[in-house]
Amino acid sequence: LDPNGIFLFDLKTDHYFKSIGCQSFCDADEEVSFIWDNDYDEEKRINSYALTLFVQEEDNRYERFDEYHEQRAFSIDEVRCAIEESGMIFLSAIDKNGAPATKDTDRVYIIAREKGKTPLQNL
């Protein structure tokens, strides 16, 4: 990282995955349509989803694309420990509005920096 740089990333939370649960979602317009089948294992904190996309080609045919994804929910404490174990400093966990993340936050933004680097100024 740059001497004054930060490491910023986001992650979806257990709260978010529980809220979408085991549901299916779909949407369609002229250029693309999708079907999203979601499954959340609360015990393992693993969210699995199958996504099928239909994308309109130039000749007006629709090409099908299938994807499968898995995401794990990590607590802020787990992320903090991983950051500190990597030799970085955990600065904060915030929501989309910049407020401290809570148990009801859907997406958490994590801010960290390298140890020994100059603290952020004029942020």
Q: Can you name each region flagged by the protein language model?
A:
Residues 70-123:
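C-terminal lobe and adjacent flexible extensions of AdoMet/dcAdoMet transferase-like proteins
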Residues 5, 32, 88-89:
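A structural micro-motif
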Residues 8-77:
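SAM-dependent methyltransferase
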Residues 1-7:
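Short glycine-dipeptide loop
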